[in-house]
């Protein structure tokens, strides 16, 4: 399954300026906030990545999957890594998750590919 999302970096920047940490804490863990280093483009990329993951799982963000259920980290080469708790991995029958984020022309775009044990 594949999920994709695109976000305006300016829109995220406006939300960060208006709501500050309250906005970030709604969808990012403390370690993810540190990884973003207060960069609007990184914050937008992480937001898009979590939305793309929810779309790949065909549930959206809501009761079955929250923003904070989705964990983002970085590889030694700075590539995004995405995971869910073991409970959510089992619930959605996920074998692996792959992710990519890109930024251009004021937008952040993210793609998530989910491989399930059923495939």
UniProtKB/Swiss-Prot annotation:
Query: Where's it found, cell-wise?
Result: Cytoplasm
Concerning SUPFAM superfamilies, the annotation shows: 4'-phosphopantetheinyl transferase
Which positions make up the signal peptide?
none
Q: Name one GO biological process term.
A: fatty acid biosynthetic process
Annotated GO MF terms:
holo-[acyl-carrier-protein] synthase activity; magnesium ion binding
Main localisation: cytoplasm
* Annotated positions binding Mg(2+): 5, 51
- What reactions does this protein catalyze? apo-[ACP] + CoA = holo-[ACP] + adenosine 3',5'-bisphosphate + H(+)
The entry's keywords: Cytoplasm, Fatty acid biosynthesis, Fatty acid metabolism, Lipid biosynthesis, Lipid metabolism, Magnesium, Metal-binding, Transferase
Q: Which cofactor does it need?
A: Mg(2+)
Q: What is its EC number?
A: 2.7.8.7
Q: Name one GO cellular component term.
A: cytoplasm
Q: What does this protein do?
A: Transfers the 4'-phosphopantetheine moiety from coenzyme A to a Ser of acyl-carrier-protein.
Q: Which family does it belong to?
A: Belongs to the P-Pant transferase superfamily. AcpS family.
Its recorded name reads Holo-[acyl-carrier-protein] synthase
Q: Which gene encodes it?
A: acpS
